[in-house]
Structure formats: structure tokens, C-alpha cells
Design a protein with these regions (language model features):
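Conserved GHKL (Bergerat-fold) ATPase module
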Residues: 1-186
């Protein structure tokens, strides 16, 4: 029995671009907004869909990164919006997030940190275990970014002259996403 399409409570808002059919005998036939909002099973279905999308993205990133990079510019606004809306989704896809640098190569956040002289999470954990008796302040890593390559070309040239790298953040959602990353990694 066809119940409805575009049920916002079943498909997370950031995944509304997905097309498909959900065959679920346990969904209630009464699809009023209040019935769906109060149904714990509907929440489980939405969480499961988010998890499966995150798993698929991670799988593509690990097994077919070249193809993943081809689609990244198209899917990144939705993934970044998903990270802002759903913390569990953000945690699952954090290692598959890519940032385009000034050479138009795609880097992960860990790669960006390494490229700018910072320490990765593994290096920081290893250092914490070896220096457990000393209290040591961790140096902050600056990652520079540009939002418009033409308008900010003088900064890009300056970065290149100094041997610095920066990431290109051209989507509208990137300003909110960068704020999210700064809060998450402080």
C-alpha cells in the first residue's frame, strides 16, 4: 500500500535529494504529522537511513576515492548540512569529508592539519600518553581558506609565495560549516 511520499520525519531533511522506495511494513498507515513525530519506530528508520548513507559514503571514499572526488563538489553541501543537522551523521562521515586546496587537490581534514604543520589526532594521543606527567599546551594549527578565487587572488598568491596552502570554500553553507568545525575541534 502506498502511504505517502516526502515524509520529512522518515527521511532526514539533508537527504531529501535521495530518490527511492522504503518498503517497511511497520510504518503506521496513519501518516499525520503528530503520529509520525511521536512514533519511535519512525525515528529509528530515519537514523538507520542516515547510518546507511554515511556507511556508503565511507565505503566509496575508501574503495573508490577517485570517483568519490568527482562527485564531491555536488554532494558536499548536503553532507555538510547533514553534519550541521545530525551530530551522529557528522561523526560517521568526518573522515570522508574533503576540502579542495589551492592546487585543486582534495584533502581530508587530517591532511589539511598535517600540511599546515599541525598534529593529527593519533599523534596527539600518542604524545599525551608519553607526556602524561607533564602538562603541555598543544599548539593551535591555522588552516587558511578562501571563499572566492577571483576576488581573493592576491591572498592566494601570497599563500603560494610563502609556501602556505589554503582550502577553497565556495559553497554558501561553508561559512556555517567552518564555524561548526572550529567549535568541534577546539
Amino acid at each position: 500500500v502506498f502511504i505517502a511520499d516526502n515524509i520529512k520525519e522518515v527521511i532526514p531533511e539533508f537527504l531529501m535529494v535521495l530518490k527511492g522506495v522504503i518498503d517497511c511494513p511497520d510504518l503506521p498507515l496513519n501518516v499525520s504529522r503528530s503520529a509520525l513525530q511521536n512514533d519511535g519506530f519512525v525515528t529509528k528508520v530515519a537514523d538507520y537511513i542516515s547510518k546507511k548513507v554515511a556507511d556508503k559514503l565511507n565505503g566509496m571514499f575508501k574503495t573508490d576515492r577517485e570517483n568519490y572526488e568527482k562527485y564531491w563538489d555536488d554532494i558536499s553541501p548536503f553532507i555538510k548540512f547533514g553534519c550541521l543537522k545530525d551530530e551522529k551523521f557528522g561523526e560517521k562521515v568526518k573522515d570522508s569529508m574533503l576540502f579542495k586546496n589551492l592546487d585543486h587537490k582534495y584533502l581530508t581534514l587530517e591532511d589539511c592539519i598535517k600540511a599546515n604543520g599541525g598534529e593529527t589526532a593519533e599523534e596527539t594521543k600518542a604524545e599525551e600518553t608519553t607526556d602524561s606527567e607533564e602538562t603541555k599546551e598543544t599548539p593551535k594549527t591555522n588552516i587558511f581558506y578562501v571563499t572566492n578565487e577571483q576576488q581573493q587572488s592576491q591572498y592566494i598568491n601570497m599563500f603560494k609565495e610563502q609556501g602556505q596552502d589554503a582550502v577553497i570554500l565556495a559553497h554558501n553553507i561553508d561559512s556555517a560549516f567552518i564555524t561548526y568545525l572550529e567549535q568541534k575541534h577546539d
